[in-house]
A protein has these predicted regions:
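Fe-S-dependent hydro-lyases/dehydratases of central metabolism
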Residues: 3-168
């Protein structure tokens, strides 16, 4: 497992005790995950669904070779030295499945080498975990390497929320 959940689990009982003390009512699993990931724990209250906005601090972020370049360019404008949240970059969306894994990866590497080179370099420089083309689809990479019960992950891929159904 590339993400260490020990810190999360060490802090979880204290956070849950505070949530229970403030809300004083039974909570759904989703509420437990959301309330223990509030960016400002001191701003905790019983938020009104559909009315209140909340700021969350996920445990990790993830992106892929389609959504990632634009997010990274935005990050570069911030002039930050490192990313503030553990994050991963998976190169999978630019691989087209046509003739089989080996020939398709060769085509992807040849046609997308500039993008892959940029993402690898920036990932190393700013602290992203980098998964090159051929590592697997991002949904599975995130699920198998970063998912843990009670955790929260922000990902730029519309299918990745399926990880929530398996514990995160």
């Amino acid at each position: 497992v590339l993400f260490r959940s020990e810190k999360f689990y060490a802090e979880f009982p204290k956070r849950m005790a505070r949530v229970r003390a403030v809300l004083n009512r039974p909570l759904t699993l989703t509420e437990k995950i959301i309330y223990t990931h509030l960016y400002h724990q001191d701003a905790m209250k019983d938020f009104a669904r559909g009315k209140d906005y909340i700021e969350l601090r996920p445990d990790r972020a993830g992106t892929h070779d389609i959504g990632g370049p634009m997010a990274i360019i935005q990050f570069l404008t911030s002039k930050k030295e490192r990313i503030a949240l553990p994050a991963a970059m998976v190169c999978d969306h630019l691989v087209q499945a046509n003739r089989g894994a080996i020939p398709d990866l060769k085509v992807a590497d040849k046609g997308n080498w500039e993008t892959y080179s940029f993402l690898r370099t920036v990932s190393g420089r700013y602290g992203f975990d980098f998964w090159p083309a051929g590592s697997g689809i991002c949904h599975q990479v995130f699920l198998e390497n970063y998912d843990f019960p009670g955790g929260m992950m922000l990902v730029t891929d519309s299918h990745t929320p399926t990880a929530c159904g398996l514990g995160m």
